Swiss-Prot record:
Residue ranges constituting the CoA carboxyltransferase N-terminal domain according to the UniProt record: 25-294
Coiled coil region boundaries: none
Protein name stated in the entry: Acetyl-coenzyme A carboxylase carboxyl transferase subunit beta
Subunit-level organization: Acetyl-CoA carboxylase is a heterohexamer composed of biotin carboxyl carrier protein (AccB), biotin carboxylase (AccC) and two subunits each of ACCase subunit alpha (AccA) and ACCase subunit beta (AccD).
Binding site for Zn(2+): 29, 32, 48, 51
Region (Disordered): 290-320
Species assigned in the record: Dinoroseobacter shibae (strain DSM 16493 / NCIMB 14021 / DFL 12)
Cofactor: Zn(2+)
């Protein structure tokens, strides 16, 4: 009985037990509610195939889609003083930081990298909205300065992807100081004659919009991105009026001259390659090395025809 209960029964149960299915295989579009398979969503750069809604994307995922072959190297960012104000609300600031690091796997809200797009060397920086709302603190200020200094040192253009709710309240006046600091960093690029291209993604608001996010030589946005200083709800409550449809969205800003382009995420890399090379005075990008073609199926050699028999050996030969 022990052999049956200890070995046979568990073996049978394991054969017929329900397999565990990972929870993240499917994702629901927040706009239209369509259930999307994770691999299909990833291949489409996290854009809904039903309604074209652009979902949030991490800096690493963005860089893998941007750089040639997904290859890039990170630029080191100086770490600022941790919790300079000893800030505490419902949680202590260090506790919030630990939770954000654990949730995202990143040390802070911005990633800086260098690599090539269309064989054109660039420096890129991207904010991570999932890290405390992408809020601009001392680290983000240091990251933008590091990106600008690296771009100037290597004589490369800087492409920045913004996604933030504004300044980080836990750092108080020190976070607001990053507005002039990052503005000076952008000025370094302009004085060096290097292109500075900004891609505004959903959402870009507050002090980020009031500083480095709106200082690009070329301003591009993803479709339907919210781009503003104060949000529409705050404005409606202040002026007590209904705002126009699509107010502060990318398409509205494009129509009113605040943006140069609104570009679908799937077309963004090609657009950035064209604009970057144009601003650098270079010709059209050279198509990268194409993968080797699939080997053609081996065609069987034609069988050699059997040698014809001599006339005298053929049946009926010599008969009259």
């Amino acid at each position: 009985m022990n052999w049956i209960s200890n070995y046979v029964r568990p073996t049978i149960n394991s054969l017929f037990s329900r397999r565990e299915v990972p929870e993240n295989l499917w994702r629901k579009c927040p706009e239209c509610g369509t259930m999307l398979f994770h691999r299909e969503l990833s291949d489409n750069l996290f854009v809904c195939i039903s309604c074209d809604h652009h979902m949030a994307i991490t800096p690493r995922q963005r860089f893998e889609a941007l750089f040639d072959g997904g290859v890039f190297s990170e630029v080191k960012v100086p770490a600022p003083i941790a919790d300079p104000l000893q800030f505490k609300d419902q949680k202590k600031y260090p506790e919030r930081m630990k939770s954000a690091v654990k949730a995202t796997g990143e040390p802070e809200a911005m990633l800086v990298a260098e690599g090539e797009i269309g064989r054109t060397p660039i420096v890129a920086a991207a904010q991570d909205f999932s890290f405390m709302g992408g809020s601009m603190g001392m680290y983000v200020g240091n990251a933008i300065i590091a990106a600008a200094e690296r771009a100037v040192a290597l004589k490369r253009p800087l492409i920045l992807f913004s996604a933030a709710g504004g300044a980080r309240m836990q750092e108080g006046i020190l976070s607001l100081m990053q507005m002039p600091r990052t503005t000076v960093a952008v000025q370094m690029l302009k004085e060096a004659g290097l292109p500075y291209i900004v891609v505004l993604t959903h959402p870009t608001t507050g002090g980020v919009t009031a500083s480095y996010a709106m200082l690009g030589d070329v301003q591009i946005a993803e479709p339907n991105a919210l781009i503003c200083f104060a949000g529409p709800r705050v404005i409606e409550q202040t002026i007590r009026e209904k705002l126009p449809e699509g107010f502060q969205r990318a398409e509205y800003l494009l129509d009113h001259g605040m943006l140069d382009r609104v570009t679908h995420r799937m077309k963004l890399r090609d657009e950035l390659i064209r604009i970057t090379r144009m601003l650098l005075g270079l010709g059209p990008a050279i198509v990268g090395d194409l993968p080797a073609p699939d080997p053609a199926p081996a065609t069987p050699e034609p069988q050699k025809a059997a040698p014809s028999a001599p006339a005298q050996d053929k049946p009926g030969a010599g008969r009259s």
